[in-house]
C-alpha cells in the first residue's frame, strides 16, 4: 500500500506547522514474519498494469463481491476500474496469478489527502468470488467496538520490510503484531519534535493508531487490513493509511477507523451474504 512515510500539514490561522517531511505512502511490513498456510484469507493485492500487473496496494475482501481499501490507493491516477485488477489471497506475489476484474471504484466523497481523513474506498468485483477456507471475507466490527489501547492486532501485506527496503523475491505475504494506541496518546507522540500547536489534532477521530518502534506497516501495505481478535472472531479494525517513516520512535502507524465508516460502507455493501 501507499502508507504515507512523512506528514504534510496545512497552515492553520497564524500557526506555523512544521511538517515531518514530504507526503509519501505506505509500502510494507516491518519487524514481522511470513504469514504461512491459510491465515488471513481476506487479504488481497491490488494490481495496476505497467509492463505487467504490478502490486501497488493491499485490500481486504469484506463481501464475496466487495474489497475495502484506502482512498489514496485508488485516487485520480487509477480511478478507472479497467486499470485495476484484484488478486485474492496468495502466499507469493506473481506466482500463478488469477487476476479478477473490477466493475466499480468508490472513494469516500470527503477524501482529499490522507491527513484530513476519509481515506477509505470500495472496489466492486465484476463477479463474486467462491468462498473457501483459503478465500473468505473478514467480518466488520459492530459500531460499538472501540478496540481499546493495548489490544494486540495484526497487519498484513506485501510491502517494504524497512524504510526503502523492498520485499525480496519470492515476495511472501508478511504479518506483524502491533498494539493499539489510544488516539490522544498517539496524537501527543506525533507532536513530538514539531512546532505544531497542541490544539491541532494530527490524529483525527476517524483514525486509529497501532504499532511501536520496530513493528509497523510500511510502503506498499497501504489499503490493507488491520485485524483484531474479539471473542474468538477476527474483526477488521482499520485500513492501512499513513505514517511518518516505518516503525520509527513516536510515530505509530495510522489507520482509517472502520467503525467510523460503517454506515457509508453498508450504503453499498450488503450486510448479509
UniProtKB/Swiss-Prot annotation:
Reactions accelerated catalytically: Preferential cleavage: Arg-|-Xaa, Lys-|-Xaa, but with more restricted specificity than trypsin
Cleaved signal peptide residues: 1-18
Residues cleaved off as propeptide: 19-28
A Pfam family the protein falls into: Trypsin
Ranges that cross the membrane: none
GO BP, sorted A to Z: negative regulation of blood coagulation; proteolysis
Glycosylation sites: 49, 130
Record key words, sorted: Disulfide bond, Glycoprotein, Hydrolase, Protease, Serine protease, Signal, Zymogen
GO molecular function: peptidase activity; serine-type endopeptidase activity
InterPro entries: Peptidase_S1_PA, Peptidase_S1_PA_chymotrypsin, Peptidase_S1A, Trypsin_dom, TRYPSIN_HIS, TRYPSIN_SER
Superkingdom per UniProt: Eukaryota
Catalytic center residues: 72, 119, 222
Disulphide connectivity of cysteines: 57-73, 153-228, 186-209, 218-246
Residue ranges occupied by any Peptidase S1 domain in the UniProt entry: 29-270
Enzyme Commission number(s): 3.4.21.59
GO cellular component: extracellular space; mast cell granule
PROSITE patterns: TRYPSIN_DOM, TRYPSIN_HIS, TRYPSIN_SER
Function noted in UniProt: Tryptase is the major neutral protease present in mast cells and is secreted upon the coupled activation-degranulation response of this cell type. May play a role in innate immunity.
Family: Belongs to the peptidase S1 family. Tryptase subfamily.
Listed name of the protein: Tryptase
Lineage, top ranks: Eukaryota, Metazoa, Chordata, Craniata, Vertebrata
Gene: Tpsab1
